[in-house]
Amino acid sequence: MAGAAAGGRGGGAWGPGRGGAGGLRRGCSPPAPAGSPRAGLQPLRATIPFQLQQPHQRRDGGGRAASVPCSVAPEKSVCRPQPLQVRRTFSLDTILSSYLLGQWPRDADGAFTCCTNDKATQTPLSWQELEGERASSCAHKRSASWGSTDHRKEISKLKQQLQRTKLSRSGKEKERGSPLLGDHAVRGALRASPPSFPSGSPVLRLSPCLHRSLEGLNQELEEVFVKEQGEEELLRILDIPDGHRAPAPPQSGSCDHPLLLLEPGNLASSPSMSLASPQPCGLASHEEHRGAAEELASTPNDKASSPGHPAFLEDGSPSPVLAFAASPRPNHSYIFKREPPEGCEKVRVFEEATSPGPDLAFLTSCPDKNKVHFNPTGSAFCPVNLMKPLFPGMGFIFRNCPSNPGSPLPPASPRPPPRKDPEASKASPLPFEPWQRTPPSEEPVLFQSSLMV
């Protein structure tokens, strides 16, 4: 039996060429010389031959024993082969493929064969028993997930317990009347909301506009962990820094707040304005309207009723003043909330829209025509004398002077009469007109204008 096991192991585990003609030879092989071809067909030294167990022991192990090597103490068999010559296999693929897959080959006849390895790689017997018990008792169950009904029932029970404890705790804390920084209309709405819910309601959810503005808040986490609209929660929501708040989603007609038109009667009669709708629609629009109402309500009445206030025109008729807008609008109907930096002039926005009163004169950029007179001294379209200077030369003036030095100088004419010299007329055959000819003593000056300065 031991020889048959060794022969079958050699033929099935190490390939078709190792067990003697594809595993057909199952008897105990006689000792072969070292040079014979049968010497390479023997199993490796790490495999120790042993006797098979009884058939009833194999049935107790079940189908699990086929994939796990049996750990049996090696016994000295009667038919022990001679000391073998250690040789390596032709390829490691034949060994590693079955080893990595965890599939031990069986005999061709279906007989169960089992091999015991060295003690260094031997599996303890207790492991095999534990594996068998685990396979028989525990079937492969699906891991607990969020979709299982048992898990959902446990979560619903926990949520109901948390809700009851938080409702009782919040009722005691709100009776103490802790102050809340912010809008009191929202606080009153939040105080009235928890008792309105029945005790059996599964989850207290935040309003859709508020929970979208929180970062990292999923709907799954909100369902698991109960979020209550309490004072601490509201303060934590309102303390989100600028730039980290998501924009408010566009809502239907219930959440659309029209811009507040502030009339002088409203400013005088209502010193503290409250919001029309107590439930906040969007966090950004809610703070925006609240800041506009607080700042405009804090304005004193004398300042609001003064004619210099931008809410009024010169004739006393009120102009519609919108609340502090988030962005400027093209119709000049907004007020800047920020003050100008140091060194800059504060400019009123509504100065361009206001019409001047009857006592104020209309200022223009041009000078007044009644006070400024323009007296033209010449024209730009006068003819230009190219060959004659504007004033006669000094030589021409002294030449025309009389011999008496005490007599006054006659007024010099700008255009003297031409001299009739036959030699000069013969010498200059150029076709010049008489007024264009100049005496030889004068020097020509180019591009002289006839404008009188």
Curated annotation (Swiss-Prot):
Q: Which residues form a coiled coil?
A: 149-175
User: Low complexity composition bias: which ranges?
Assistant: 269-278
Region ranges (Disordered): 1-45, 159-201, 269-320, 406-453
Residues carrying Phosphoserine: 29, 67, 178, 193, 201, 213, 319, 327, 413, 428
Residues annotated with Phosphothreonine modification? 299, 354
The UniProt regions of compositional bias labelled Pro residues, in chain numbering, are 406-416
InterPro entries named among the record's database cross-references: Glcci1/FAM117
Tagged with keyword Phosphoprotein? yes
An example Pfam family from this entry, by short name, is FAM117
User: Which family is it part of?
Assistant: Belongs to the FAM117 family.
Name by which UniProt lists this protein: Protein FAM117A
**Species per Swiss-Prot/TrEMBL record:** Homo sapiens (Human)
Question: Gene name?
Answer: FAM117A
